[in-house]
């Protein structure tokens, strides 16, 4: 098992949920956390514990991005007009690594981050290797010509376990996608319940 897969499944076990809806997730076989005594850890969480868990789950979904980067995203969401939780989701879904994953060019968010880092992606015709690049409505994201035959990409396009959301238009023949709009929370197809309102409460303490 690759380091990327180990990290992905470690997050699933830590959360006790299959947060990406993957068929091979270990939590499909058991309902307790990692470690020999993981099954003993269940109990009623405090309000702080519930908020912390909501933050860890949302942060984990996007590739377990650093706390510094996640908090910076939250602070930007809080400065914007409107609902902070909605803004937070919109900013996270606008990340280039999230768009590549949602477009089904790669099988996991972790693969997306590595794919971008290795220079396989163009945005509006220019190579971009910044995972956190903020996509804007109308941006065209495509797999570079030399990268289109990578097994990683071909396998992902064939996966039927998740659909491309309506805020992204994807052409899998051309390996090209357009970021149509910043989504509302209700538009985002999470495999498990996410609670951005609790994340806001966590940082508002």
UniProtKB/Swiss-Prot annotation:
It holds the Pfam family Ribosomal_S4. Residues 1-46 are annotated as: Disordered. One of the primary rRNA binding proteins, it binds directly to 16S rRNA where it nucleates assembly of the body of the 30S subunit. With S5 and S12 plays an important role in translational accuracy. Part of the 30S ribosomal subunit. Contacts protein S5. The interaction surface between S4 and S5 is involved in control of translational fidelity. Belongs to the universal ribosomal protein uS4 family. Residues 1-16 have a biased composition (Basic and acidic residues). The lineage of its organism: Bacteria, Pseudomonadati, Pseudomonadota, Alphaproteobacteria, Hyphomicrobiales. Keywords: Ribonucleoprotein, Ribosomal protein, RNA-binding, rRNA-binding. One of its GO terms (biological process) is ribosomal small subunit biogenesis. Residues 94-157 form the S4 RNA-binding domain. One of its GO terms (cellular component) is small ribosomal subunit. One of its GO terms (molecular function) is rRNA binding. This is Small ribosomal subunit protein uS4. PROSITE patterns: RIBOSOMAL_S4, S4. It comes from Bartonella quintana (strain Toulouse). It comes from the Bacteria.
């Amino acid at each position: 098992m690759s380091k990327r897969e180990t990290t992905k499944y470690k997050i699933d076990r830590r959360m006790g949920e299959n947060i990406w809806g993957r068929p091979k997730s270990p939590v499909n076989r058991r309902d307790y956390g990692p470690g020999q005594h993981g099954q003993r850890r269940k109990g009623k969480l405090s309000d702080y514990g519930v908020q912390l868990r909501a933050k860890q789950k949302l942060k984990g979904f996007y590739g377990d991005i650093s706390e510094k980067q996640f908090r910076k995203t939250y602070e930007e969401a809080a400065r914007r007009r409107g609902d902070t939780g909605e803004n937070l989701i919109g900013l996270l879904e606008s990340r280039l690594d999230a768009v590549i994953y949602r477009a089904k060019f790669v099988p996991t968010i972790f693969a997306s981050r590595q794919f971008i880092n290795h220079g396989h992606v163009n945005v509006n015709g220019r190579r971009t290797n910044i995972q956190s690049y903020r996509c804007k409505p109308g941006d065209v994201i495509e797999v570079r010509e030399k990268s289109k035959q990578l097994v990683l990409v071909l396998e992902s396009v064939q996966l039927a376990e998740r659909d491309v959301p309506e805020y992204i238009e994807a052409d899998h023949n051309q390996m090209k996608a357009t970021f149509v709009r910043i989504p509302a929370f209700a538009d985002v197809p999470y495999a498990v319940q996410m609670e951005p309102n609790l994340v806001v409460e966590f940082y508002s303490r």
